[in-house]
From Swiss-Prot:
Compositionally biased intervals (Gly residues): 68-78
Entry protein name: Homeobox-leucine zipper protein ROC7
Family, similarity comment: Belongs to the HD-ZIP homeobox family. Class IV subfamily.
Protein source organism: Oryza sativa subsp. indica
Function (record text): Probable transcription factor.
Lineage of source species: Eukaryota, Viridiplantae, Streptophyta, Embryophyta, Tracheophyta
């Protein structure tokens, strides 16, 4: 203030006295704030930021002028006054109505006048420049306070609306009941207070952050401007399930009375159970032969409500497995959430899958929060193990630590009028409790996968020969899922290799395009073989005969307008039996080219030559080959054999199909493999128990074209011929592997 006085020494003494009185007012401001009326004009140290004391005095725009009282306005500096002298009485000068109107009009045009504009106003209105300056400061403070109050009221009303909506959801979930039996709907082991209040707290924290951001960034702006400048929270700051609401989603499958909050609660509860199941150790999981076993009593204590009561008609299966796979975590999540890629990745386990409804697409750019209703059919490569069909929710979420989780859970008890009900799982024979995997990013493009399978299934139709395998989890458990995933990830890495020479290839493959086409053709061959063994409904097989362990199950299918299969009537014969030798020995025998003539009718006693070889992983048993049979007495010189061999801890496969030479040349040159017609045959080899040290369970399956006319009638002679062929092959394999010196029966030509 002293510098200001020095810069204006040429002004009149009266002005100097007023400046001095203003300075004295600041000295006394803190002591007499409670005495000031709401319309006092005060001084400030800065031009845009009024002190907090001035906020309390600016309610009416600052239209009064406060000066020192007493006689004629004379007096010296505050430092020259007697400290014992009683402070003079203050007096206030209210601005005239004309002055206020002029100041208000100028404020609308320019709320921040500069020094020149303030001096002009002071001359026009008969005020001091400092009075004009402080009036504008207080006016801006007043406007800021009003806008703050308006915005806070709006946000408070919005917050109350969210609380009311939350209470409605709470009441709906608390009173949820099964529409068929009227009983309570069990939607997870978490109570509402454990989970929904947690969601409410998270949402309220978001609202607090939002209000704070507005107050810090947009204070002083009109409410409309704030709304336009501060859009709704971006997807990354919202719950992933907030993206639900795709037009038409859920209407067809769930019905018109589809309860979206209940489905959300089911998915969230399943996700939390999966994460805990994957992370907890003993006593929930205990070491067992071939892996880990779930403690049922501890599970009941850890998840007291579970996801509905267990059905007494279904047997519980639970398993957990962990592995590091050669696939990027983002790519793995993408494959799990795409039904086509998921089916191809696990073609030996999933014979059919479909996405029925997409309830949430998740956050843009990834699958965080994606929620969809799916159906699937799971298979075991044997006619003695029935397939398992189910419908389930699949929910994907990225957790704060970066870990991805994908969980499946059946919809039992939630769906009415769409094949649902209180116990639809018992009718279908399969129910998925929270099952899925946690995916953690690892260096160099690898991912750590922890897989949990927890299902209830009806195993009454499983043949006694396969019950030890099914009960141990090697048939449908986490160990098989993870082993298949490891093997398939290595296969995909091999398919993406750009250097043909360094990838273990040999023979006629010269380009990476031809290599990928050949691998794609082999992939389709394996999927067709597995679907034929189990009589999957996807592949439209009709069972003609076969029920016992020694029986051959014969199925038929008509192929029309399918470029991937020859037109006509196709017979599929499959049988399973036990061999008293380890699976590795059976696998090595069946994939050995030198012993192929001992069992393969296609070789017809000729010499088998490998023309191309593609290594599919670290295990030398995982490979795709192109074989030629050299037989001087055969007229099939134009026939090649495409073969894929694969093995892992839970089983092995040797699958092959005759292919035309011309069509195969197109594939080797990078052509479309979908137009190559093939009928696969082959073997599935499984250990007969979880220890893997006993015998083997071998499944043999042939697909044979018996008539090229699709409308022709199937003759009994064709069925008898196929039965004889598979019986002959089984006897030859038994004789060769077990060392039986007996003469194998001749196979039909």
């Amino acid at each position: 203030m002293q510098s200001l006085l020095d810069g204006h020494h040429h002004q009149l003494p009266s002005l100097l006295q007023q400046h001095h009185n203003g300075h004295h007012l600041l000295d006394q401001h803190q002591q007499h704030q409670h005495q000031l009326p709401p319309q006092a004009t005060t001084t400030s140290e800065s031009d845009g930021r009024a002190p907090r004391d001035e906020l309390e005095m600016s309610k009416s725009g600052g239209s009064d002028n406060l000066e020192s009282g007493g006689g004629g306005g004379g007096g010296g500096s505050g430092d020259d006054q007697d400290p014992n002298q009683r402070p003079r009485k203050k007096r206030y000068h209210r601005h005239t109505q004309h002055q206020i109107q002029e100041l208000e009009a100028f404020f609308k045009e320019c709320p921040h006048p500069d020094d020149k504009q303030r001096k002009e106003l002071s001359r026009e209105l008969g005020l001091e420049p400092l009075q004009v300056k402080f009036w504008f400061q207080n006016k801006r403070t007043q406007m800021k306070t009003q806008h703050e109050r308006h915005e806070n009221n709006a946000l408070r009303a919005e917050n109350e609306k969210l609380r009311a909506e939350n209470m409605r959801y709470k009441e709906a979930l608390a009173n949820a009941s099964c529409p068929n039996c009227g009983g309570p709907a069990a939607i997870g082991e978490m109570s509402f207070d454990e989970h929904h209040l947690r969601l409410e707290n998270a949402r309220l924290r978001d609202e607090i952050d939002r209000i704070s951001a507005i107050a810090a960034k947009y204070v002083g702006k009109p409410a409309a401007a704030v709304s336009a400048a501060y859009p709704p929270l971006p997807p990354s700051n919202r719950s992933p399930l907030d993206h639900m609401g795709i037009p038409g989603a859920g209407a067809d499958v769930f019905g018109a009375d589809f309860d979206k909050p209940l489905v959300i609660e089911l998915a969230v509860a399943a996700m939390e159970e999966l994460v805990r199941m994957a992370q907890l150790g003993e006593p929930l999981w205990a070491p067992a032969l071939g892996g880990e076993a779930l403690g049922e009593e501890e599970y009941a204590r850890t998840f007291p409500r579970g996801l509905g009561p267990k059905s007494p008609e279904l047997r519980s299966e639970a398993s957990r497995e962990t592995a590091v796979v050669i696939m990027n975590h983002v790519s793995l999540v993408e494959m799990l959430m795409d039904v086509g890629q998921w089916t191809a990745l696990f073609s030996s386990i999933v014979s059919r899958a479909a996405t029925l409804e997409v309830l949430s697409t998740g956050v843009a750019g990834n699958h965080n929060g994606a929620l969809q209703l799916m159906s699937a059919e799971f298979q075991m490569p044997s006619p003695l193990v029935p397939t398992r069909e189910t419908q389930f929710l699949r929910y994907c979420k990225q957790h704060p630590d970066g870990t991805w989780a994908v969980v499946d859970v059946s919809l039992d008890g939630l769906r009415a009028g769409a094949g649902g009900g209180c116990q639809p799982a018992a009718a279908r024979g399969h129910r998925r409790r929270p099952s899925g995997c946690l995916i953690q990013e690892m260096p160099n493009g690898y991912s750590k996968v922890t897989w949990v399978e927890h299902v209830e299934a009806d195993d009454q139709m499983v043949h006694n020969l396969y019950k030890p395998v099914v009960n141990s989890g090697m048939a449908f458990g986490a160990r098989r899922w993870v082993a298949t995933l490891e093997r398939q990830c290595e296969r995909l890495a091999s398919a993406m290799a750009s250097n043909v020479a360094s990838s273990g290839d040999a023979g006629v493959i010269t380009t990476s395009e031809g290599r990928r086409s050949m691998l794609k053709l082999a992939e389709r061959m394996v999927a067709s073989f597995c679907g034929g063994v189990t009589a999957s409904t996807t592949h439209q097989w009709t069972t003609l005969s076969g029920s016992g362990a020694e029986d051959v199950r014969v199925m038929t299918r008509k192929s029309v307008d399918d470029p991937g299969r020859p037109p006509g009537i196709v017979l599929n014969a499959a049988t399973s039996f036990w061999l008293p030798v380890p699976p590795s020995r059976v696998f090595d025998f069946l994939r050995d080219d030198s012993t192929r003539s001992e069992w393969d009718i296609l070789s017809n006693g000729g010499v088998v030559q490998e023309m191309a070889h593609i290594a599919n992983g670290r295990d030398h048993g995982n490979a795709v080959s192109l074989l030629r049979v050299n037989n001087a007495n055969s007229n099939q010189s134009n026939m090649l054999i495409l073969q894929e061999c694969c093995t892992d801890a839970t089983g092995s496969y040797v699958i092959y199909a005759p292919v035309d030479v011309v069509a195969m040349n197109v594939v080797l040159n990078g052509g479309d493999p979908d137009y190559v017609a093939l009928l696969p045959s082959g073997f599935a080899i499984l250990p007969d128990g979880p220890d893997g040290g006993g015998g083997s369970l071998l499944t043999v399956a042939f697909q044979i074209l018996v008539d090229s006319v699709p409308t022709a009638k199937l003759s009994l002679g064709s069925v008898a011929t196929v039965n004889s062929l598979i019986a002959c092959t089984v006897e030859r394999i038994k004789a060769a592997i077990t060392g039986d010196n007996g003469v194998a029966p001749p196979c039909p030509r």
